[in-house]
């Protein structure tokens, strides 16, 4: 389960971010694009390192390190979301990835794609963590 999440961080994130809606977005300054590419490269390296730790150097300690490393990405995303007003940030740009619309009990809600993806990642890593930790205490 963690491996699938990590593959998503290593493969899907660059597919989303290394295109005209992000890294080559003509509306972004070069410096903003630099920071995005830096962030995505760090996420790819973290994911690949995590996969190596899980599959080739598997231990309880390394498993916990992988969980913590990847929670860092998720929690830093939410910290940034909560701090958007501090730096006049936006979750999305005019020519960015469009939001998702869901219907709950007849009412339509707009959910930013970033929030949706990271919340899904949070659910997966939390579930995987609970399974891993409960397995530690049951054996």
Language-model regions, residue ranges each:
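Interfacial segments of alpha-helical transmembrane regions
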Residues: 1-6, 58-73
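C-terminal TM-helix exit segments that contain a strictly Trp-centered aromatic cap at the helix terminus
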Residues: 11-17, 75-91
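Interfacial loop at the N-terminal end of multi-pass membrane proteins
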Residues: 12-37
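Interfacial non-cytosolic loop connecting adjacent transmembrane helices
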Residues: 25-34, 87-108
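Core segments of alpha-helical transmembrane spans in multipass integral membrane proteins
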Residues: 33-54, 71, 75
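Core segments of transmembrane alpha-helices
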Residues: 42-50, 118-127
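Individual transmembrane alpha-helices with interfacial aromatic-anchor signatures
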Residues: 103-123
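Juxtamembrane boundary at the C-terminal end of a transmembrane helix
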Residues: 129-139
